[in-house]
Amino acid sequence: KNLNDSTNDLLNQLSLRHCAHIPAGLLSYADQRSLEIGITIASGANTIMLDEPTSGMSNSETARAVTLIKKISEKRTLVIVEHDMGVVFDLADRISVLVYGEIICTDTPEKVRENQAVQEAYLGIERNR
């Protein structure tokens, strides 16, 4: 493939084909975040770190970002730092939960949901002891 074909393929993968001729600074915030992911993909990285990839997005933009992240995670390893637990549970195969900089749990989403320390710290659930 030539560079134009590869670029067009990536823009299609990112759902950004419609704004190929728009300067990056004029794109919506969500499209700018998608473009940032695309630049990382174009670099050939097999492992990608995403810091708060849905922060500041509307519900519809978050849903679109989650769909994109799921798609790119099929071929790459992703490390995601995210405070939106709904997004975390939707995306992750394994989760490490930190409280004040210390890991309190690392497990599957199902096990993390059931973990008492996580429930108390993030979900506001306290059990009788």
Place the predicted regions along the sequence by residue.
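Glycine-rich phosphate-binding loops of nucleotide-dependent enzymes
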Residues: 1-129
